[in-house]
Amino acid sequence: MTERVATERRRKTRPKAKPGTGAEPAAEMPGLAARRAAARLLAAVVDARTPLDGLTDSEHGNPQFTALDPRDRALVRAILAAALRHRLSIGALIDSRLDRPLPARAGTLLHILHVAAAQFLFLDVPDSAAVNLAVAHASADPRTRRFTGLVNAVLRALATRKERALPKVLATTRDAPDWFAERLIAAYGPETADAIMAAHRIEAPLDLTVRTDPGGWAQRLGGRLMPNGTVRLVQPGTPVPELAGYAEGAWWVQDAAASLPARLLGAVDGCDVADLCAAPGGKTAQLANAGARVTAVDGSANRLRRLAVNLERLGLSAEIVRADLASWRPGRLFDAVLLDAPCSATGTLRRHPDVAWTKSPADIAKLAAAQRRLLDAASGLVRPGGRLVFSNCSLDPEEGERLVAGFLDERPDFCRDPIAPTEFDGLDGLVDACGDLRTTPADWPVDDPRWSGMDGFFAARLRRTG
């Protein structure tokens, strides 16, 4: 028999039960519940376009996930991250072991295969454990039982040849849906687009914004000081709340790119500043730490509670307002306004690898329209001569450059207040010809890609002239 799997032949035969092959009663196999949950959640992401964060919330997530113990929850998160970061590469490897396509309605089977392959290709899970649990999973599910032999053969073939096959596939496959790759290429050109998609395959580091002495904290935590003053850690191996400085409120978690928009407001000590769509509060903390009188506005009570807890830990204060920005009338104007608008979040792919699979071009158009409405509302809160910074974590110009250009075309009472690359450390190479901020996961490259990059962000600084 050839190395490729004869699909029809595998359908008609089932392997005999042998210890360790996954043919034992499914309920007796440790780890099977976690793999079932991973396959179920993978289906929810790629088939139903359900955001992963909600599915894996420890308190309110998918019941199959929340029923697991903390260790298995962490495993499920790791499996899903690997399966989504490398979705098309895994799919290509699976296809290479089949002599014909799987049936059109074999979604559950594919999810089982992807979950197993992600473990032995990209995680520190023994080949035999991943394969045996996948076989047990397939044999216990009536929808996939007849494919048990195929699952066993495909996965064992992949595991045997992974050292040779995986590098070739990774070098020739873009692990992103076509619509996303095409929009990146149109916006940034093929070279930068490929660099962004390559960065998506690597887990993002842990970035911290510190209140004082970033160099000292970088040394104390075993991290690196980034050009903008962010302290960066790679795989710290310690839960965030247990890291030095957390309990004392010395720092907060914030991607390096996310820390830039608040700084674009300039010196805010003693100024009245509105932070709109403020939760969970990283930018509010920056502004308060810089001496601003901050009004933090958000429409979500749950997110504002989290913001309040974060500020309390940091020993910072702000006026916290729950309101719909479209109808909020504070009765006064602000010296400066920061609007970090809800968006497609395509710039956060390293942290949220589901985004490219749960969003679509239609979603981007709808979100851009919603952001324009928020920008119109925010503009009415700025005093004459005051600054307005509009930002989001999208890589798409429809939500950034083109949106701001349209706003300025229709609003003669506002003008662009161009950002200078020399305003503060870390901006070099991140400011475009119009004076807007644009970051991508391909920025700040270093030899070890684990230390490279940042979230994709856009920010424009505007000034009210009338």
Question: What is the role of each PLM region?
Answer:
Residues 1-466:
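S-adenosylmethionine
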